[in-house]
């Protein structure tokens, strides 16, 4: 993609005003930047590695949107891959900038001198403060990087990658690409019968399923036992994944109908609103049924990471159906792609906010107190975030659940320290884990 042309009056210089190319406004790009900081910041408060990986993957997308913009699906996809590609083009751009600074008497040597003075001041005052307070000295020691040969190599590699990323980001901010013109080829429309008949048939099928679901919801477990011959938990487990797939596929069907259905006549527009509106409303009932099934299943067998994550995904799909319903009624959906990504990021941040590993541990500890059933082996595999909840277990279950977490080490370095691990260390210091506890073998759900 070619960068946007220079703003008028700048004579083709590199100083192009961000947002001058029709990309999302500064407020939208600032929102993506804030989302990126929040996603990366999850690692400073949560110890769950699986959660941080998901947040980093989402941050890759939001970083591209913050730097490059993009409103259409294709533009948003391209913005994701632009930052690493921009690094190569940023190198000659940075070289020209440094040459211009030297010509103006502001060479790179003065920048290095400023950095050297800053490091010197930090070193002198850091040594004085460390010698004055032992606690501050321990904190500073934990934050200092490893100065061994392997440590220096690791940190040098990291800073080179970070510097390259920052350079590419600076290039995109000063020379934003024009992504709003990236749209797919116009889709050919089909005749009314070719899209209305399949949608009407699908609406009828959804309506029949929804009637059955309402019967189950109001009839309860007795109705399921009489008609399906299954326990309520087995019934819930058997259908959740299918309903999750139905929810995702329905969104694809709606997207295809919106793309290929004609809207030239008033009759076509009314049919789109009625058929797609009905499908969207019925899909919300399917989402509610899936969520109810997962609730029953979790109450019967306990909470796990997978069950909590797919529940979050199902809530997100329900929100998408609401947004799609609004777009169908208005027959406008240009804002939907950004809201799809935005709501996904919000759902992920919401999952991080509830502290999923601790939430899972608390749910299972409460369930143990009510039923006496507990999967100690699974809980022992949770992260340090779960320690405050697992600390409520009686011995020897407490030590059995916390032993592997405590043995993982303090992890106080700059790259691994976070709030979750700090809380766990404090609890282990106050209530050490018993190394000689005998762990029961048959605590499974």
What are these regions (language model features)?
Residues 333-337, 349-374:
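Hydrophobic alpha-helical transmembrane segments in integral membrane proteins
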Residues 119-135, 205-222, 287-296:
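Alpha-helical transmembrane segments and their membrane-interface junctions
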């Amino acid at each position: 993609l070619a960068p946007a042309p220079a703003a008028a009056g700048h004579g083709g210089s590199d100083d192009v005003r961000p947002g001058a190319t029709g990309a999302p406004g500064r407020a939208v790009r600032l929102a993506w930047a804030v989302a990126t900081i929040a996603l990366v910041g999850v690692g400073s408060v949560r110890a769950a590695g699986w959660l941080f990986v998901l947040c980093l993957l989402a941050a890759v997308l939001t970083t591209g949107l913050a730097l490059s913009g993009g409103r259409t699906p294709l533009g948003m996809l391209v913005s994701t891959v632009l930052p690493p590609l921009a690094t190569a083009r940023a190198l000659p751009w940075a070289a020209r900038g440094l040459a211009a600074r030297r010509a103006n008497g502001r060479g790179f040597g003065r920048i290095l001198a400023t950095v050297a003075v800053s490091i010197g001041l930090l070193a002198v005052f850091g040594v004085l403060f460390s010698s004055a307070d032992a606690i501050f000295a321990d904190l500073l020691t934990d934050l200092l990087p490893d100065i061994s040969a392997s440590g220096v190599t690791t940190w040098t590699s990291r800073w080179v990658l970070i510097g390259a990323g920052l350079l590419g980001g600076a290039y995109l901010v000063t020379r934003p690409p024009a992504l709003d013109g990236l749209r797919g080829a116009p889709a050919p429309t089909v005749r009314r019968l070719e899209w209305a008949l399949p949608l009407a048939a699908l609406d009828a099928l959804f309506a029949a399923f929804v009637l059955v679901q309402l019967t189950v919801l109001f009839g309860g477990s007795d109705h399921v036992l009489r008609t399906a011959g299954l326990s309520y938990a087995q019934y819930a487990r058997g259908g959740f994944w299918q309903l999750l797939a139905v929810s995702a596929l329905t969104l694809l069907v709606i997207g295809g109908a919106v793309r290929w259905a004609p809207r030239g006549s008033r009759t076509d527009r009314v049919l789109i609103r009625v058929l797609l509106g009905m499908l969207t409303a019925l899909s919300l009932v399917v989402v509610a049924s899936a969520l109810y099934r997962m609730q029953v299943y979790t109450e019967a067998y306990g909470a796990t990471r997978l069950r909590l994550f797919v529940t979050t995904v199902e809530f997100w799909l329900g929100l998408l159906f609401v947004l799609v319903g609004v777009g169908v009624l208005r027959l406008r959906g240009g804002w939907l792609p950004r809201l799809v990504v935005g709501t996904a990021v919000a759902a992920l941040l919401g999952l991080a906010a509830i502290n999923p590993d601790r939430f899972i541990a608390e749910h299972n500890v409460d369930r143990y107190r009510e039923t006496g059933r507990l999967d100690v082996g699974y809980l022992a595999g949770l992260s340090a975030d779960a320690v405050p909840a697992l600390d409520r277990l009686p011995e020897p279950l407490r030590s059995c659940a916390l032993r592997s977490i405590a043995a993982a080490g303090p992890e106080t370095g700059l790259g691994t320290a976070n709030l979750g691990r700090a809380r766990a260390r404090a609890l282990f210091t106050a209530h050490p884990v018993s190394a000689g506890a005998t762990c029961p073998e048959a605590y499974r759900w």
